[in-house]
Amino acid sequence: MKCELCGGELDAVTLRCTGCGAKYTRVCVHCGAAMEAGEKACPRCGGEGLPGLDMTRQELTRAGIKCFMPYAGDRVYDIYFGGNHDGGGWEFHNERGYVREPPESRVVLPALVEGRPIYGIWNEFFCVGDEFVPGRQEEAYARMMQIRQIVVSNGVREAFTYSFFNCAGLETLELPRSMVSMKYDFYDLFMDGQEPMGNGVKKSPVTIRYRGTEEDWRKVAVTSRFWDYVAKGCIKMEYLGR
């Protein structure tokens, strides 16, 4: 497997990238559990383990990526990509989870933070609706148009309804075989067939590069609108195989 950050080879034993030194930890593609070094099958469910990008908190900060753990009462939930003014509970006031300025054209989302698996991508991770009020739209679109490619590492399991909200310049989205639910339906990008900023320019298709087979993808929960957009050519599927 190639490093998702630099394209270098991973050391077969340590799972460190031989190019940039990035750390990878084996993650079960079926249940999302982190696995010990040397384990090829998940001891919990028997699922296949694949290397997932494992960042430190400092590395996440440098990359402009926020994570948080929602909580309600005495229950603490999994780790998600995203931000929340309230920190948790049933009340959520989203704030941007990707805060790098200026944004990178290619954003890589890891699967773990210091060995702890990241479950999914929360709503409005890249931008929030408040950024598109009159007077702020031009600035928001200028930032979002810079993000052309998003790569999600092996182990992440879910993308929420507004996880890629208004990623206006998105051209390629690479998703792992561990994905079980893709709730984002691209409606905000293709509702009129034009680029979201209403400039009359036709929106180019988004290519989803899926690290699995077409049969695998058919098991992922998606919306009915998703397949409508595939049929219309707004979304192009590319199956990379196992």
Predicted regions, residues:
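The −1 position to Zn-ligating cysteines in a subset of zinc-ribbon hairpins
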Residues: 2, 16, 27, 41
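Structural signature of tandem-repeat unit edges
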Residues: 62, 68, 74, 101-119, ...
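Detector for the canonical C2H2 zinc-finger "Cys2" submotif
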Residues: 7, 32
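Short Cys/His-rich micro-motifs in 6-15 aa windows
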Residues: 21-29, 45-53
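Consensus positions within tandem repeat domains that build extended binding/scaffold surfaces
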Residues: 124, 160-163, 185-188
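Short metal-coordination and nucleic-acid-contact micro-motifs, chiefly zinc-binding Cys/His arrays
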Residues: 13, 24, 38
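Short beta-strand/loop segment at the start of cytosolic alpha/beta domains
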Residues: 52-100
